[in-house]
Every structure is written in C-alpha cells, then in structure tokens.
Amino acid sequence: MRRTILKSKIHRITITGADLHYEGSLTLDEAIMEAANLVPFEKIEIYNVNNGHRFSTYVIPGQRYGGECILNGAAARLGHAGDIIIIVSWADLDEEELKNFKVNLVYMDEENNIKEHKVTTVFSEEVKEIAERNKNLVRD
C-alpha cells in the first residue's frame, strides 16, 4: 500500500507580490525552499488564509534571503501582497519508506524570516504525544 504524506510545510508566509504576466509558478526565497526541502519545479499546494483559495502550482527559486513569495501567472489572481498563505508538498510513499521519512515544517514570522524549523517523522514521540492527547476527543 502507498500513502500520501506531508513532505514540506511552510506555515504563514506572506505574499510579497503578484505578476499576472509571468508564465506561472510561485517565486520563493531560495533559502526558504531549502529549509522546506523543496526543489525547483516541484508541485506545491497553496492555501490562502485570507480568502480561502486553495490551488496548486510549482515553485521556482527567488533571491536568497530576500523573503520573496510572489504569485505568478494565473495564480496572481488568487492572492495579493500581504495575504498570509500556507505552502505544502506531498510525498507518495510505501510502508517501508514511511518508517524513516522526514517531514519538514517551516514556520515564518511577519517579515518572511524563518521563525522555527522542525524536522519530524510520522512516528516521532511528538506525534505520538499529540495522538495520545487527542484520543479522548473520539466519541464512542
């Protein structure tokens, strides 16, 4: 069996611009891409916290340490400078790959600086603790 698992998450990054006439994609600060384990032309999903739009595109590197997060092409219609977004990518893994797979979680501040960077696994102690805390939310 294969499972689709979160590979990378950039949480609450601010859109810095939009270029409707660029051919497509999201331009993202190269250092943020590396922290999140994203490579150029990788498929990503974008969730716009401000307006609820959810869409997919691909990522291309922007200026390193510039804080760039620019919607390009048709995606430019789905967000504006100042909007807060969440960027995710997924991995398709078999059961063996899942055992040691590392998830990159990158948390941003208001200036598009990395506030926190976590690398975790599906079976980490932290994830087990969250599951344990939430089990009493399940109703019989």
Swiss-Prot record:
Its EC number is 4.1.1.11. Its cofactor is pyruvate. It holds the Pfam family Asp_decarbox. InterPro entries: Asp_de-COase-like_dom_sf, Asp_decarbox. Is synthesized initially as an inactive proenzyme, which is activated by self-cleavage at a specific serine bond to produce a beta-subunit with a hydroxyl group at its C-terminus and an alpha-subunit with a pyruvoyl group at its N-terminus. This is Aspartate 1-decarboxylase. Keywords: Autocatalytic cleavage, Cytoplasm, Decarboxylase, Lyase, Pantothenate biosynthesis, Pyruvate, Schiff base, Zymogen. It comes from Persephonella marina (strain DSM 14350 / EX-H1). GO terms for biological process: alanine biosynthetic process; pantothenate biosynthetic process. The active site is at 25 (schiff-base intermediate with substrate), 58 (proton donor). It is an enzyme of class 4 (lyase). Heterooctamer of four alpha and four beta subunits. The modification Pyruvic acid (Ser) is found at residue 25. Pathway: Cofactor biosynthesis; (R)-pantothenate biosynthesis; beta-alanine from L-aspartate: step 1/1. It is found in: Cytoplasm. Belongs to the PanD family. Signal peptide: none annotated. GO terms for cellular component: cytosol. Substrate binds at residues 57, 73-75.
